[in-house]
Amino acid sequence: METIAIHRHARSSAQKVRLVADLIRGKKVSQALETLTYTNKKAAGLVKKVLESAIANAEHNDGADIDDLKVAKIFVDEGPSMKRIMPRAKGRADRILKRTSHITVVVSDR
């Protein structure tokens, strides 16, 4: 049984979150949580919350055994970007893109 959890509009760029997502793809959830706990990146905290949510969904909604679960799929898509302005010299301005991402974690007992 596959169970999904999604975090939309996470305030980190998809490029940065994908570095962390690649670390846990295909691992058992216990090993993935341990990896994320000791990964020194902001994105690790974001991915860990989504993984914990997927585990809770599997346990509560599907009655799955946590020990059998593994990370079947994890992918990160780009979300909308917030446009901000950075004042520059001589009255000019640059546009700053505050990027967001959508993190999707699928856990499965197979």
Curated annotation (Swiss-Prot):
Disulphide bond pairs? none
What does UniProt give as GO cellular component?
Answer: cytosolic large ribosomal subunit
Give GO terms: molecular function aspect only: rRNA binding; structural constituent of ribosome
- Record keywords, A-Z: Ribonucleoprotein, Ribosomal protein, RNA-binding, rRNA-binding
Cross-referenced InterPro entries:
Ribosomal_uL22 (IPR001063), Ribosomal_uL22_bac/chlpt-type (IPR005727), Ribosomal_uL22_bac/org-type (IPR047867), Ribosomal_uL22_CS (IPR018260), Ribosomal_uL22_sf (IPR036394)
Q: Which terms does the UniProt entry file under GO BP?
A: translation
Q: Does the keyword rRNA-binding apply?
A: yes
Annotated signal sequence is none
Keyword match Ligase: no
Subunit text? Part of the 50S ribosomal subunit.
List, alphabetically, the HAMAP family matched.
Answer: Ribosomal_uL22_B
Family of the protein in this entry: Belongs to the universal ribosomal protein uL22 family.
| Purpose | This protein binds specifically to 23S rRNA; its binding is stimulated by other ribosomal proteins, e.g. L4, L17, and L20. It is important during the early stages of 50S assembly. It makes multiple contacts with different domains of the 23S rRNA in the assembled 50S subunit and ribosome.
- What is the protein name stated in its UniProt record? Large ribosomal subunit protein uL22
Which gene name belongs to this protein?
rplV
